[in-house]
Amino acid sequence: MSPGLPVSIPSQPHCSTDERVEALAPTCSMCGRDLQAEGSRLLPCQHLLCKDCYQGFMQELGHATRAYPGKLISCPGCQRVYLTRDVTEHIFLQCFSPVKPTMARNCSECKEKRAAHILCTYCNRWLCSSCTEEHRHVPAPGGPLFARAQKGSSGVNGGSGDFALYCPLHTQEVLKLFCETCDVLTCHSCLMVEHKEHRCRHVEEVLQNQRMLLESVTSQVAHKKSSLQTSAKQIEDRIFEVKHQHRKVENQIKMAKMVLMNELNKQANGLIEELEGITNERKRKLEQQLQSIMVLNRQFEHVQNFINWAVCSKSSVPFLFSKELIVFQMQRLLETRCNTDPGSPWSIRFTWEPNFWTKQLASLGCITTEGGQLTRADAAAASYGSLQGQPSFYQSHQAPMAQQEALSHPSHKFQSPALCSSSVCCSHCSPVSPSLKGQVPPPSIHPAHSFRQPSEMVPHQLGSLQCSTLLPREKELACSPHPPKLMQPWLEPQPPAEQESTSQRPGPQLVSQPVCIVPPQDVQPGAHAQPTIQTPSIQVQLGHHQKLKLSHFQQQPQQQPPPPPPPPPPPQHAPPPLPPSQHLASSQHESPPGPACSQNVDIMHHKFELEEMQKDLELLLQAQQPSLQLSQTKSPQHLQQTIVGQINYIVRQPAPVQSQSQEETLQVTEEPPAPEGPKPALPVDKNTAAPLPQTSGEETPHSVPPVDGTSQHSSPNVVRKHATSVSIMGFSNTVEMELSSTRLARTIEPQIHRVSSLTAAPTHTIPSLLSGPPQTVSSLMSVSNHAMPSLTASHLQPVPNLVRGTFQSTSNLRGDSSQAITGLASNHSQAGPSLMSGHTQAAPSLATCPLQGMPPVSDVHVEPRSVSSPGSGPAAESLGTRDGAESSLGNALCKMESEDCTRFSDSVGQGPTASSLDGPKDLAIPSELEEPINLSVKKPFLAPVINTSTALQQYRNPKEYENFEQGALELDTKENSDIRAISSEPKIPYVRLERLKICAASSGEMPVFKLKPQKNSQDGNFLLVIECGTESSSMSIKVSQNSLPDASQGPGLGGRKVTVTSLTGQQPQEVESTSEEHRLIPRAPGAKKNTPAPIENEDFCAVCINGGELLCCDRCPKVYHLSCHVPALLSFPGGEWVCTLCRSLTQPEMEYDCENARYGHPGVRVLPGLSMYDQKKCEKLVLSLCCNSLSLPFHEPVSPLARHYYQIIKRPMDLSIIRRKLQKKDPAHYTTPEEVVSDVRLMFWNCAKFNYPDSEVAEAGRCLEVFFEGWLKEIYPDKCFAQPQQEDSDSEDVSGESGCSTPQGFPWPPYMQEGIQPKRRRRHMENEKTKRVSFRLANSISQV
């Protein structure tokens, strides 16, 4: 293809924008400056050079300005070599270069070059005011004037025909023909002269053929590019995996070092204490003997002095008188015996085996690899390549013979470093063989790259470690070796030739000491005894599991009889090892181990690693128990971060042997990943909760969530949380709800419409429903528990029921300009808020009974609106309780009072709800004996009391619950005789709440309800405060009234607008009710409505909540943009149209005009993907998520500027990616529904992993996940989808600088070698991590 052919490429209409921008890069590849229209060069590799760089580059190569053909030129960008004749002028830049703002603003027509005022867009010339009048465009047919005006400039439309390239020979002729024989562009004149007999065609025909060829080539390039991106992503994941594994093993080694140091200090301190005890006992005995001798000596001196004085005195009579006493005393002293034997010389010494412990330290641990082919030659090449500054991945292609030699002679390539600087370091060490000198690798090699195996250690190298115990400390330090780092010591046995050569060398012949390992019996009391595994000639090199006392390992007496000469050590120490001679005798008859023995050793290694790490975790859990009690809701991965600190990884891989008891023990200390399949909710009601022998004092707020449904009843290690329900007006039965982890609840009612908020309800508070006066009650009531901050915040099954209606007009009822009453009922884990509006000033109630003195009006039973599908119907608010934190609602009296304080003689038990008072201690007490609670300021005006009684029956799903529970709502309306008097002065509501008989919680405190007006009472803003001890919660209540109703309307709703606000940031939804429609008519409980309400479409798109050109569904109120709908539509349909949520899956009413429909036309090769049935189901799932108001943060990817997000989240996922992969033309199109569900769950998992559990985004993600699982169960009722496994990674240490996938595509690393060098992150101090953890815990406590 000729260099001039690329001129036709920009005119292709199907060329994508990204490819066009890539081909027309505006900067020079050498200097990086903007290119000029003249003199720029285009290389065959599509790199660009400016005029100056090209000339300088050619001069540096020794060429002239005009390069000779046949010379070579190297591209400065990609280093590829081309012929200089292939470098062409950059015609693209001339064709598509924009008008520079720095161009001259002078007139191009007149000679005076006056200032230009107008730009002629037709010929791209600046004109002054005088030339503008004369400037006209009257093109003559075939005239050259128009062509010259367009020479070298883009036309008006920017098409291929507007840009003209003129012949260099015939300057007036345009190159409109293409000679296929010569492969060049030509004009008519050249065609007649040089290309007479050649095959020439018009440029447009050639463009059409070339376009088809380029499209096929472009598709192939795109496929190869996608495969390369996938491969590069996998390799990059491997790089970060290696980095993560390196940090993990490094932390394990550090932990082993720390544990060994602690054990050494403990043992040394024990020995010192033992020494002090022995010496102190010996010293005490000698001091007692010395004291007795000194006392006897003083008595002798005293008697001797007395006798001398008596003899020397001149009076003899006293001497003779006391002679007998003196003789008796002297005789007694002579007969007194005293132990004067000091005993034999007593010596004490400390004996230990330095050689044994040196060997043990030398075999402290090993580094094993699983998977991947990393030979020793590759490791050595990587080590030496890193020293020489060369990339290690090029070494394998340069010296194949060196690799074979290294593999055939591993002992010469991987000898251990010399332990002594000279052949004999001291008189007690054996000489080092001269053959070992010169084989020591350079000391600058990183120790992580040095590999050696114990079987290759020269025997007299081991012998050189055996120094005498009586040497001075300096000599012992000189002889002690550095612990070598081993790599798979048992995978490559010693060659026979090496064994023969070592057996012939002089010096003490030592082999690795056989170690017999027995599992510790005190780790698991119920565990079965594991068989003893012996490894005769292999050093079992365990990791940090050697940190405990050596009594856990029992040595068999057949192989290692205890030597009698040394004294027996304390019980906590292991028997001393064999002397070198006994080691030699016991190891001479042992053969090298086979593959089975190596596998057994590997099995034991994993088993003991798990056991010891489990013990470490238990100790850490006990040490940090207070902090753990406040962080039970955190994921297992986050729990490890807060507990272990620097230990960033804990092995959870079970050993490949029978370790059932071990796994049962691990269930107590670690939170396992979520089990597969949803966990059914418990159908808790009065009947099922009654036989539970549970009291309010038995609750255990600090508990570990159970693993699955089976372990909740069988495993004794599972701790349950008994939620104490609050008995209100006779409901004294307690409810026991089992907790699960934050991502286990997957069950939800199919009739769910929209999840709006969650409520955090502790066990000893009353999340009872409170409806305030002139405003709707918010659908979120959060009561914080400082001892247990929202243990599980995602398990609720809210079923919103919005009941709108009017009360039937009666003869004794009159219209009133009253406010709305909102009755909310929280029922177990299912919440059904029923919003009922009536003419009343204010009546906050839970559930009411008829009042005395008024004839009750006929009960009005209202059924909740039936919802055909979870996503259809108008949006409704929802109220839920967290994790079944139960609130049992009883009945309460709520009435309005005037100044005279009307007395009621009717008892509480009378009425339709008297049957619910079944508690033994809840008696029917007359209401006049109870003093009401006043929550508002009394007004001086009077009003007659009019009572209206209504009963609201709560619907319960028969599939999940077995019975119904009724709650009665009684409205007491009160009106003023003079409406003008009311409207002329400020309205202050007057509310009286009857005292509720409430069973006190375990803390013994009762809740206190306060109603406070905010700012201006005329606005209808009130604050409802609920206080229970030190905890408090509040909600804002507002009722807006559009206009005062007429008296002729009766007790209708009067066109009032009720707003239910949610504290989770969801948009308030307004429900307008009028007296002409939706009247509450007395009917049977099972009766249905006569005429359904007409569908009023929404004003904003159900997905993006924006306006514009919207497409209305004929079966539901939702409207969509064409691009927001799933699947995205290409054109507006004609006639009746239904959305994906309303369209039938089995018999669709219509087919959408979308990409998938056009992609599936006959003749188009279709890649394997979802079936049509599964495609419709998955589109319905995704659209239901997009229509949820909580899904707005998940519509688009996280901004690439949030670098911390892509450091923590390795696999970003959002709804836009899922929608794109649902298209059949996408290379990553889904093939099974499991992939769709896995991506959606991955999106929720990323949300829960990155955000704090108490944040709004995390709470929205949990609500949306519950909503999705309900839809999934409805669409796929008979299919079970596996739960995603938790990622085995630590967000603190796994840095994803370049591992994130941004929306613009795969982030390729730069060409330089520094691009693949990982950045080193600053390690945090331990105290900083502790502060950060405590700060998160404090935030989780203060969150309401």
Swiss-Prot record:
Per the record, the zinc finger regions (PHD-type) lie at 1098-1145
Q: Where is the composition biased (Pro residues)?
A: 481-496, 559-580, 672-681
Where is the stretch described as Disordered?
Answer: 478-513, 541-600, 655-719, 861-888, 903-924, 1284-1344
> Could you tell me the gene encoding this protein?
Trim66
GO BP: any one term: negative regulation of DNA-templated transcription
The record lists Zn(2+) 2 as bound by C167, H170, C190, H195
Q: Which UniProt keywords apply?
A: Bromodomain, Coiled coil, Metal-binding, Nucleus, Repeat, Zinc, Zinc-finger
- Species source reads Mus musculus
Q: What is the name of the protein in this document?
A: Tripartite motif-containing protein 66
Cite the record's tissue specificity text. Predominant in testis, specifically in elongating spermatids.
Cellular component per GO, a single term: chromocenter
Subunit structure comment from the entry = Can form homodimers and heterodimers. Interacts with CBX5, CBX1 and CBX3 via PxVxL motif.
